[in-house]
Amino acid sequence: MEKLDESKFEQRLQLWALRIPRELSSAVTRLLRSGYLLDKPRVKTVVEDPEGDKNRLVILSEKIQKPDLSDMPQQELDSLKQLCNVDVVPYTLTLGYSYWSAGHVAHLNISDDLLPYKNVIAKVIYDKNYPRIQTVANKVGTITNEFRVPKFEILAGKNDMVTEVKQYGATFKLDYGLVYWNSRLDHEHIRLVSLFKKGDVICDMFAGIGPFAIPAAQKGCVVYANDLNPDSVHYLRTNAKINKVDDYIFAYNMDARVFMQNLMTVPGLETGSDCQVAADESYPKEGVPANENSSSNGNHNDVREGSQNGANESSVASTTAKKRQQTSEECESDCQDGDASQTKRRNNKRVRGPGPPPSKPWEHFDHVLMNLPASALQFLDCFDGLVQKKYWTGSLPWIHCYCFIRSSESEESILSNKLNAKIAEPIFHRVRDVAPNKAMFCLSFKLPMECLREDDSENHIESVA
């Protein structure tokens, strides 16, 4: 048997920590426990200071990105300075081989040469980690289904893939056999959400069970979240309710192109037969607030209801837009001042405020998330002519598109002919290596002005149909 290289499982997080007198550890953690401390299972937030015994290091959350602590509200910062002199130091956290699991499920990806020993490997993992680990599953084959969900073989323990994962102050319920989840991407989720501001409107085209949508809603953003997988949308709604942000998340279950077209349909705008958007009739056409038709332990059919209503695509888009407008009018009160994420407590209190601010996405949205690295680039062309210039207000949105880039490919080749417009100053953030010659990146850029259309012509939609 080849020796297991445990270093391949390591992930290093570059964080910030506060060096404080050890006698103030409890006071500081009480002050920062409302979302500003590192929140990872089995990881201590207060650790020894390698430079001396008189001090301790308090590890800060991933969302604290700046050493001057300007990410933190001034009130908390002032209270902290009253306690002691603030000494901010860099801190590297290494999450090693023994850390990775999803709730009670240990997910393995055993290489071909070790497959003869798979049962032995699984039994050792199960025996040494029970009861924390109650199911050991191995990924089987390559992902080929349309929902990008891997197949698993249960090697040890009970056949129960429904579990809960806690990350950055949020709880995610999922069925590992029905939806996609990667515990190693939590740092990337926080990195991107840290770019959002309270009140921002977010369009999540491939939302999954909510790894971006939930923390964005906790921050006070309005999130239009879509996924093609009905099971993912079921757990997205469930997780929105668990984390008490269901008033901020509107869940859709449809093709991503149709999702964006529906959001950008202006209420009352007449559409001709040439601009009808083709959609798969097996999916409902209307976005539903996450607090409707949802149950954390209910039947998954809740996301499939309405798929047989027989309405044509153009009337559906108009109905959806009118429903959004009605919802916006019911929420005219502005959110209370202060970051909504401050109100998130470990007992999972509902985000404070009267609900999300009015949102008309055909007039303005701030960020679009495209977290489907295997094929998201193919959807960039849906932004060509999507936004009507005469209705748009404010600055153009940021697009965040995840993709894989091989060592033989260049960033220029990735961008060519994807949007039918020149992308100015694209930002490529390297997320992680997925193979020796392949890495996952997040491409971020402002939507070019050339992508806006000048009039009500919908000829561009032919490419979406």
From Swiss-Prot:
Query: What biological-process terms (Gene Ontology) are attached?
Result: tRNA N1-guanine methylation
Q: List the disulfide bonds.
A: none
Location in or out of the cell: Mitochondrion matrix; Nucleus; Cytoplasm
- Main EC class of this protein? transferase
Q: Which parts of this chain are annotated as the region Disordered?
A: 283-362
User: Which residues lie in Polar residues bias regions?
Assistant: 291-320
Q: Name one Pfam family in it.
A: TRM5-TYW2_MTfase
Q: Which UniProt keywords apply?
A: Cytoplasm, Methyltransferase, Mitochondrion, Nucleus, S-adenosyl-L-methionine, Transferase, tRNA processing
Tell me its family.
Belongs to the class I-like SAM-binding methyltransferase superfamily. TRM5/TYW2 family.
PANTHER family hit by this protein: TRNA (GUANINE(37)-N1)-METHYLTRANSFERASE, TRNA METHYLTRANSFERASE
> What does it do?
Specifically methylates the N1 position of guanosine-37 in various cytoplasmic and mitochondrial tRNAs. Methylation is not dependent on the nature of the nucleoside 5' of the target nucleoside. This is the first step in the biosynthesis of wybutosine (yW), a modified base adjacent to the anticodon of tRNAs and required for accurate decoding.
Spell out the protein name for this chain.
tRNA (guanine(37)-N(1))-methyltransferase
Organism per entry: Sorghum bicolor
